[in-house]
């Protein structure tokens, strides 16, 4: 076998292999690209500074540093470089914002400057590039579609329920699913003695959003519903893995399994939604609006004139809006509920306080309602602390500057990608006393009788400003209704002697490791039982 420099030269000059000339051309191209990468960065105008940050490697930037737990790495770096810092991912400069006040300054007070989305290649496959959440568009048409989506979602959540036991449709849907879960969990206890509730939570939460968006509740073993749940899980897994080609342009011209998988799962989900929308079109009756999809179709068919023509939704945008609403109302709620149940099991004394509050305020005869939220401050504080402590959404979807701007004295050029480190803000020792500890009381007044709105508003989970999650209100309501209904009926614990690892696993939403040791038992006999 040939070895050493001489052998290498022989191979380089062999027919069919890379020649010395090609090596020189490749090296020159690399140097040119490196030079372009360095010169493409705009220098700050006189009197301003560019954000500080760690040096990166040529072509790779800081990718290697950020491979594992980027929320923790960026939090550590923020201690050195401050709340406005710059890292490089591939050849792309990225500004990372930390600190609650800095994030509020950017997303709320300078909202127009930071409301853009970066034009990442992979995002064109989300709703065929028409996604409200991922699209780089942020003009009047986008704002009108976003408002339409919010109104439709809210309308079919708080609309009056036909049943006397619920005050609105959301309560009715959640009550149906939560009752199913209570029965299912008790059945699983008889069969297995311990289990993992998360897959059942997923299906129930998916059923709620299906009922609101599509007017349909599925059986829990329905293959269409399970397929949707699996697609959403696939989307989260692929998106969390990231696509290097979004930040390293050269990789776009090479075979890319990650991009292919992302494209495939989005195409399958769009086809699922498109089929349902087409079915709604064929059965649409403007005198009988059944769900969010009907509401959007009705709005689409209204004749618009003048300025309104530009913002009228198309048939294609209806599919993308429903796509977004489903995504906004599914994975975040499921993950938040799974964390709430884990914390309730880990801290039984806290669980008992919640149940005592439920017994005293609601009793055991009727189910919790949204109108009870204001009378259950400790329960609300528990949910907020679960949001803060888990920081299940460590980052928002990346933002982008819409024009040259200045933040905290640092110059940030137009079209700069911006990461919002929500995890850092939720664990900032400057804001929170003893942030690693789980303490719902931090959100209550001194007497423990009222929720502190000031403290509650410090928790970042759904983003801020003009790109704030459109499903935030519905998501918070769902978590409250599911959790209170389950804890009213069941006592949650972990199997004795089992070690549980709740270290968040980094992803689009952060989850703890699979845990098969949940145990549940009924808190009191059913009405009419012995």
UniProtKB/Swiss-Prot annotation:
GO CC annotations? Answer: endoplasmic reticulum membrane; intracellular membrane-bounded organelle
- Record: residues binding heme: 469
Choose any GO biological process term that the UniProt entry carries and state it: xenobiotic metabolic process
List the Gene Ontology MF annotations in alphabetical order.
heme binding; iron ion binding; monooxygenase activity; oxidoreductase activity, acting on paired donors, with incorporation or reduction of molecular oxygen, reduced flavin or flavoprotein as one donor, and incorporation of one atom of oxygen; oxygen binding
Location(s) in or outside the cell: Endoplasmic reticulum membrane; Microsome membrane
**What residue ranges are annotated as transmembrane?**
none
Q: Which Pfam families match?
A: p450
Q: Which UniProt keywords apply?
A: Endoplasmic reticulum, Heme, Iron, Membrane, Metal-binding, Microsome, Monooxygenase, Oxidoreductase
Entry-linked InterPro entries: Cyt_P450 (IPR001128), Cyt_P450_CS (IPR017972), Cyt_P450_E_grp-I (IPR002401), Cyt_P450_E_grp-I_CYP1 (IPR008066), Cyt_P450_sf (IPR036396)
What is the E.C. number?
A: 1.14.14.1
Chief subcellular location? endoplasmic reticulum
Up-regulation conditions: By 2,3,7,8-tetrachlorodibenzo-p-dioxin (TCDD).
**What domain of life does the UniProt record list for this protein's source?**
Eukaryota
Catalytic reaction annotation: an organic molecule + reduced [NADPH--hemoprotein reductase] + O2 = an alcohol + oxidized [NADPH--hemoprotein reductase] + H2O + H(+)
User: Which pairs of Cys residues are joined through disulfide bonds in the record?
Assistant: none
Which cofactors does this protein require? heme
This protein's membrane topology, according to the annotation, is: Peripheral membrane protein
Q: Which family does it belong to?
A: Belongs to the cytochrome P450 family.
Role according to the record: Cytochromes P450 are a group of heme-thiolate monooxygenases. In liver microsomes, this enzyme is involved in an NADPH-dependent electron transport pathway. It oxidizes a variety of structurally unrelated compounds, including steroids, fatty acids, and xenobiotics.
What PANTHER family does the database record attribute to this sequence?
A: CYTOCHROME P450 1A, STEROID 17-ALPHA-HYDROXYLASE/17,20 LYASE
Put simply, this protein is called Cytochrome P450 1A4
Its source organism is: Gallus gallus (Chicken)
